[in-house]
């Protein structure tokens, strides 16, 4: 259940209660694609040191390896990972349309080949729900088609209509699965996904249509896939007035610190992105003064922490010079330390956004940090 505590402009401060714990909103979901965050980050790190409230795992990848039935046999993702806070699983749709080979889209679902071994696979709304039920996640995402941007108007119209029909099937199947004896999580929630490319009218009509289904939450999908930032913000502005006020709002795959601040200002509650972990593994460090690349020669003898304004475990214990040395020496510890710092930074960013909303000074926070956090230093 989502409770809206207060607003400042369109920005929202709330509490989201789930069967696996309460989440303070707005929040960032740390991305553990294959039930692990790349960079050697364990569930113990996430819970004890990195201020993580919720993790995101990937249905497509877990279905292929180790297999959702194996995860079910192990007691579901929470037991498998030893992670006892909320987990969101995406539907697999994005990966089917971005990674899989030789896909064929039909009304019943999608036929495709595994990107791993070429094996023929079928996934439709019911199959996606069954896989996510086996995983036992807190929140399941509906199976949808994520169209390329730009795409022809007629194709996007037809795709959205099919995505709506798939969503109705997802809802029906989720209700059936949750009622079965032996279901790992009989309280599994379902979020619908708004699509429509960059066409305002399709986006709005699709959001109005799926808002009538009374789902547990709603996402804006199909953005942050190459379109200009201004276009993404415009789509959020168009769609947000039609999203239910009493349900969490999720912007999928976003983004930079500035993207998050600006999207919170537009009424978004939930975010996920591989950026903090992926960029960290290549030496890109987020700080409260901007973005630095730790392998630059300027940091060879720099005794400061990665961010002097950060109190994460890495910044409390290691210097820029040391972390730079680890990257240059190609030590595995380099990526782990950088990922730990960046994830802590993102979760701390959300904590500070929530605090600013609590204290009625979010706009001041936005003015101070929105541009600063994305600049190169």
Model-derived features: positions:
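Conserved, mostly hydrophobic/aromatic
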Residues: 21, 55, 90, 132, ...
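Glycine-rich phosphate/ribose-binding loops and adjacent secondary-structure elements
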Residues: 161-164, 173, 177, 185-306
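A non-catalytic, amphipathic alpha-helix used as a structural packing/dimerization or gating element
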Residues: 127, 131, 135, 158-169, ...
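Glycine- and acidic
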Residues: 149-152, 157, 217-223, 332-335
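Generic secondary-structure signature for well-ordered alpha-helical cores
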Residues: 137, 168, 172-175, 241-244, ...
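Non-catalytic, usually N-terminal nucleic-acid engagement modules in DNA/RNA processing proteins
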Residues: 1-184, 297-300
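C-terminal extensions of enzymes
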Residues: 1-15, 23-30, 38-40, 144-150, ...
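Surface-exposed helix-capping loop/turn segments at secondary-structure junctions
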Residues: 173-183, 247, 353-365
């Amino acid at each position: 259940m989502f409770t809206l505590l207060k607003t400042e402009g369109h920005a929202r401060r709330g509490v989201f209660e789930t069967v696996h714990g309460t989440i303070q909103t707005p929040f960032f979901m740390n991305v553990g694609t294959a039930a692990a965050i790349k960079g050697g980050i364990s569930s113990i790190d996430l819970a004890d040191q990195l201020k993580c409230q919720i993790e995101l795992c990937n249905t497509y990848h877990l279905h292929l390896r180790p297999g959702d039935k194996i995860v079910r046999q192990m007691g579901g993702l929470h037991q498998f990972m030893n992670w006892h806070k909320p987990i969101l699983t995406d539907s697999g749709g994005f990966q089917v349309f971005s990674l899989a080979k030789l896909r064929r889209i039909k009304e019943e679902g999608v036929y495709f080949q595994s990107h791993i071994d070429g094996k023929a696979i079928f996934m439709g709304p019911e199959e996606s729900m069954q896989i996510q039920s086996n995983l036992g996640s807190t929140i399941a995402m509906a199976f949808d088609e994520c169209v390329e941007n730009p795409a022809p108007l007629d194709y996007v119209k037809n795709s959205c209509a099919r995505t709506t029909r798939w969503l109705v099937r997802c809802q029906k199947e989720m209700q059936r699965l949750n009622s079965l004896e032996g279901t790992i999580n009989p309280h599994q929630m379902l979020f619908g996904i708004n699509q429509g490319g960059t066409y305002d009218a399709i986006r709005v009509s699709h959001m109005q249509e799926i808002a009538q289904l009374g789902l547990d939450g709603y996402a804006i999908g199909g953005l942050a896939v190459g379109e200009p930032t201004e276009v993404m913000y415009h789509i959020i502005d168009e769609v947000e007035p039609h999203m239910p006020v009493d349900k969490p709002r999720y912007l999928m795959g976003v983004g930079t610190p500035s993207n998050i601040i600006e999207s919170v200002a537009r009424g978004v509650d939930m975010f996920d992105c591989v950026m903090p972990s992926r960029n960290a593994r290549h030496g890109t460090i987020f700080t409260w003064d901007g973005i630095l690349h730790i392998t630059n020669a300027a940091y060879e003898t720099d005794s400061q922490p990665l961010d002097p304004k950060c109190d994460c475990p890495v910044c409390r214990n290691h210097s820029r010079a040391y972390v730079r040395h680890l990257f240059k020496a190609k030590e595995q510890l380099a990526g782990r330390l950088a990922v730990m710092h960046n994830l802590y930074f993102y979760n701390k960013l959300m904590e500070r956004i929530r605090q600013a909303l609590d204290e009625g000074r979010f706009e001041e926070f936005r003015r101070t940090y929105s541009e600063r956090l994305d600049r190169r230093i």
